């Protein structure tokens, strides 16, 4: 009786004992007050900002809405969350009581060879490894941090999808624009070629002029297939991200043209925003927390393990019309004390400490890389704006020069070479403008991704906008359903 009272008094003290190992504290690192080309105003919570809406492109909006539902990478990341949640249960299970039940029955001869003996019994066993030094509590703490890291990985998968999808859409529209430019130039050059043939018949042009005009026509025809190929490659990638047939996406894109232009404000916030908004920083911090908790797990293994165990076994015996019951029970503690292990347990502690130190370095590197990514993207966007404006003015100037050269050639005041050179310059300037628009749009994407905006944005696509993609998905699912 006294032993039970002693156990009842000591047990709460053992279970409430402190855990070994360091407690995790959120790491800190000095950051600049502002980005070199940014403002001093915080951007706030950018996670819910659907920045792709600033392109004012309904097709793009419907693709993003559909992609977040259908993308396999996002679904794969969600499955990792489920696995991490199960690991939390597994990590804490070792510190909980374990019960088992065994039922047995046997028949045999008794002491008298003419009698039969029937014995049936039930055994209920209970074991409880007391988490005196916090091994399983630290293990659970580590697993919970890993679960948080898995949730951050889902956010990473969502934003990676959005970045890939929007960038591929920008590329597809760029190649569409290039094809349109080349076809318009082909028409103009074909007209010049036809006019030159008429000039030859009238004796006002030479065979060399015809060959030069024809060469420019052939050159333009030759560049179109490559541009069409690149358009289709971009469309194929969009289809893969949306789990749609390529033909469906190509037909949707061919219904309209025009490069997406970002119309939103440039608001990169301040470096301190990145600690809150960048899920890769949050993921690195959670990985550090998990590694720190593992130090406590390793240190707890250096100390004795105390296990309480007990069992109760009622048995029923029947022989020659007589029967009776027997009750057996046992209860007691056991102590497992590590003495000689060749230094393995202490080496585990050192390994855990090194892993935690490496996790801190990884966190700090992630923070510094995040700041650089925003700095680079912000600088690129501001310069891209000037480049696009200059390219646009260049196109206007050269197109005006082409008109003057064409009119002068028609009047016989200048040579065909002047017209052909002006056409080449127009073609080059138009291609450069399209590339500048593409680069500006993609750098806006890069900036918004760098500040980690939009991964938790609500779906804003209306049913009318998303009807095409939704109908295509429904047809695919019905075609593959049994």
UniProtKB/Swiss-Prot annotation:
Any one GO CC term of this protein is: plasma membrane
Keyword field contains Manganese: no
Q: Which residues form the signal peptide?
A: 1-17
Membrane topology type, per the record?
Answer: Lipid-anchor
Where in the cell?
Cell membrane
One molecular function GO term is: efflux transmembrane transporter activity
InterPro entries in alphabetical order: OMF (IPR050737), OMP_efflux (IPR003423), RND_efflux_OM_lipoprot_NodT (IPR010131)
What superkingdom does the record give?
Bacteria
* This protein's UniProt keywords: Cell membrane, Lipoprotein, Membrane, Nodulation, Palmitate, Plasmid, Signal, Transmembrane, Transmembrane beta strand
Tell me which Pfam families the record gives: OEP
Lipidation feature positions (S-diacylglycerol cysteine): 18
- Keyword Cytoplasm in the entry? The reply is no
Query: Which residues are modified by lipidation (N-palmitoyl cysteine)?
Result: 18
User: What family name appears in the similarity comment?
Assistant: Belongs to the outer membrane factor (OMF) (TC 1.B.17) family.
- Name of the protein in question: Nodulation protein T
Which species is the source of this protein? Rhizobium leguminosarum bv. viciae
This chain is encoded by the gene named nodT
